[in-house]
């Protein structure tokens, strides 16, 4: 029996070293993935502003966390005395987000694979072929009749005592 080479990641995920640590990303994503592929980061200008606003111990919501391009640095910024609560409804992006948290040894993030809205239940999102070029973060749940069912929740149901900062990147 001859050994077969092991492919370390699925073909729709690549690994790069960013200024915040190693990050997995979908190289076919036209925005977040493309930015990681070319620069090793995404929207650094936004993160530069967050650094001026946030301090250790802060409670942060990352709504539309995608692969964690902001989640990882936000968690590092607020430190172990703070917490980031991250919401990402797309199952594949949520899995990459969780993998990036593990890769960067980030213990102060709670992730939820769900969308947020004004009611609780389920909604549908489009199903992507991650081997094809697309804006994977640019989905709309408005007029989707077919697709993958995902949980829909209300932020109020989390009964958070306080929130210091909300990063919101949703369609």
Q: What do these predicted ranges mean?
A:
Residues 1-171:
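Phosphate/nucleotide-binding beta-alpha loop and adjacent structural elements of enzyme active sites
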């Amino acid at each position: 029996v001859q050994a077969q080479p092991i492919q370390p990641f699925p073909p729709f995920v690549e690994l790069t070293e960013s200024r915040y640590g190693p990050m997995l990303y979908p190289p076919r994503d036209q925005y977040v993935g493309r930015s990681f592929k070319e620069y090793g980061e995404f929207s650094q200008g936004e993160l530069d502003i967050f650094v001026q606003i946030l301090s250790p111990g802060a409670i942060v919501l990352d709504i539309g966390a995608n692969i964690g391009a902001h989640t990882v640095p936000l968690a590092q910024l607020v430190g172990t005395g703070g917490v980031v609560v991250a919401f990402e409804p797309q199952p594949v992006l949520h899995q990459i987000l969780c993998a990036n948290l593990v890769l960067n040894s980030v213990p102060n993030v709670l992730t939820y694979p769900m969308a947020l809205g004004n009611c609780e239940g389920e909604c549908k999102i489009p199903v992507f072929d991650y081997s094809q070029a697309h804006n994977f973060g640019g989905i709309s749940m408005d007029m989707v009749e077919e697709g993958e069912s995902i949980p829909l929740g209300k932020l109020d149901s989390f009964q958070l005592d306080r929130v210091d900062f909300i990063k919101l990147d949703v369609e």
